[in-house]
């Protein structure tokens, strides 16, 4: 979560830290896991939040959180705003729930074939069913899309699942289960209960069945900064900027 506010001194300082990290790490790709902006005007805040990455010529991708579309621009409008920015790899699947659902294949060193996959999901914003409170969840059609795409990649790879990671904003309910189990080992800092949705639509189970995703990376909970292995999949947080 960058939570960029245009013309905010705090955001400018955060931008300096982001620049330091980018210069030190020199990543091949940056993925923003939602709540990129938190101030109006939305377009200016978004451009400023992405600028340190764009300035360095580093490819990037964005998925949206629950706050991004609360600042005067819809998810689709934000997607259209960033789609032609230099280095942007964010994509969308027409007809699928949400906006920022896409797959980034990682090629083998010789560029001959896909060697790994990065699955990015739109985890939406808030609960939309009567009687259900809290945050939104990845919908059934998104889970089915993942199942179908994962199967295609596995079949194309001779029946062997391609190593994959997944990125979205709101943590899965399994983040709760993992930390409540005495047999798990948590690395990092946990200062609050994961603000996961009350509805579990089975994405974690689908990932286990597919056998490709080794790690899930989310944001959303600002004072959580940890990784925990649950049933063979690492459940991780990205640090709040």
What are these regions (language model features)?
Residues 1, 18, 30, 35, ...:
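Divalent metal-coordination and catalytic microenvironments
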Residues 1-6, 115-125, 167, 233-240:
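Active-site-proximal beta-strand elements of phosphoester/diester hydrolases
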Residues 1-52:
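N-terminal active-site segment of His-dependent metallophosphoesterases
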Residues 5-7, 38-41, 62-73, 126-129, ...:
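Active-site environment of divalent metal-dependent phosphoester hydrolases
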Residues 25-30, 55-61, 114-117, 159-164, ...:
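Loop/turn elements at helix/coil->beta-strand transitions in domains of secreted/extracellular proteins
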Residues 31-36, 153-177:
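Short acidic, glycine-rich surface-loop motifs adjacent to enzyme active sites
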Residues 47-159:
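Extended active-site neighborhood of metal-dependent phosphoesterases/phosphodiesterases
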Residues 182-241:
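Conserved beta-sheet core of the metallophosphoesterase superfamily
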């Amino acid at each position: 979560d960058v939570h960029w506010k245009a013309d905010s001194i705090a955001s400018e300082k955060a931008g300096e830290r982001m620049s330091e990290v980018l210069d030190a790490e020199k990543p091949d790709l940056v993925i923003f896991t939602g709540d990129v902006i938190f101030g109006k005007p939305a377009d200016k805040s978004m451009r400023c939040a992405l600028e340190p990455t764009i300035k360095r010529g580093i490819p990037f991708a964005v998925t949206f959180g629950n706050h991004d579309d609360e600042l005067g621009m819809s998810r689709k409008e934000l997607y259209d705003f960033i789609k032609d920015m230099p280095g942007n790899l964010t994509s969308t699947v027409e007809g699928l729930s949400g906006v920022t659902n896409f797959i980034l294949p990682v090629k083998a060193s010789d560029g001959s074939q896909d060697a790994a996959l990065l699955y990015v999901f739109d985890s939406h914003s808030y609960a939309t069913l009567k009687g259900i409170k809290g945050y939104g969840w990845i919908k059934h059609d998104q889970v089915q899309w993942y199942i179908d795409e994962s199967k295609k990649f596995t079949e194309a790879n001779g029946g062997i699942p391609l190593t994959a990671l997944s990125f979205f904003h709101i943590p899965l309910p399994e983040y709760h289960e993992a930390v409540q189990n005495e047999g798990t080992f948590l690395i990092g800092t946990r200062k609050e209960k994961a603000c996961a949705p009350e509805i579990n639509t089975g994405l974690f189970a689908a990932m286990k069945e597919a056998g490709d995703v080794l790690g899930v990376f989310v944001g959303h909970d600002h004072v959580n900064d940890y990784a925990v292995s649950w049933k063979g999949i690492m459940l991780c947080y990205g640090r709040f900027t």
